[in-house]
Design a protein with these regions (language model features):
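Short, low-complexity N-terminal leaders and the immediately following helix N-cap/first helix
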Residues: 1-65, 130
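Short, glycine/charged-enriched hinge/interface segments at domain edges or termini
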Residues: 54-190
Length: 190
């Protein structure tokens, strides 16, 4: 049987791959075998994507001096509600104050006691990661999909400990023919 006929016979076979459940940290480079349903929004709330000061965007341009009400560290709750002339110190990953929708990055501010002076800002860059930006509750991650670092990070934040992946195939290579030589052998000339 020639190579092309053999390949044709192989491809006629209905080869299916079974799946296995493995620890998330072992899944890099593997292929997801079942869809995953997302059980919560990621991020779970609006967060700052930069270190700076949370303000109301509508206040920018009208007001250049803002009173600092306090700060919200990453991982902490924020009960702050700001007025147009107020701000809250935020850090990357911090929860945004309930009615703030813009972060003036710290490089564009000057500290004056308990106030900041805004030196400039890019109105097209609010530096806010909105609730559900990465994943929305109820969303499905389809399969098959190659699991990379980004997906592992997201699944870890969603508390997935195990994932269902396609089992690694067992492959055998069976060389045949006189072109195969033992190590150290020399090919015969015709």
């Amino acid at each position: 049987m020639n190579v092309y006929s053999a390949l044709k016979e192989i491809f006629k076979q209905n080869i299916s791959c079974s799946s296995e459940n493995i620890q998330l940290e072992e899944s890099l480079g593997r292929t997801l075998s079942k869809p995953l349903r997302i059980n919560k929004n990621i991020p779970e709330f609006d967060t700052s994507s930069m270190d700076g000061f949370a303000v109301k965007k509508s206040s920018l341009g009208k007001i250049v001096r803002f009173k600092i009400l306090g700060e919200t560290a990453a991982g902490a709750d924020s009960d702050f509600v700001i007025n147009p002339n107020e701000c809250v110190r935020v850090y990357t990953g911090s929860r945004m104050p309930k009615n703030a929708d813009f972060v003036v990055i710290q490089e564009n501010t000057r500290l004056e006691g308990n106030f900041i002076h805004v030196n400039g800002y890019d109105k097209n860059s609010p530096y806010v990661r909105k609730l559900g930006l990465d994943f929305k509750k109820g969303q499905t991650i389809s399969h098959p999909i190659l699991i990379d670092y980004k997906l592992i990070s997201a699944l870890a934040s969603l508390n997935f400990e195990k994932v269902s992946v396609i089992k690694k195939p067992r492959v055998c290579i069976i060389p045949t023919g006189n072109e195969i030589l033992a190590l150290g052998s020399k090919a015969k000339k015709k």
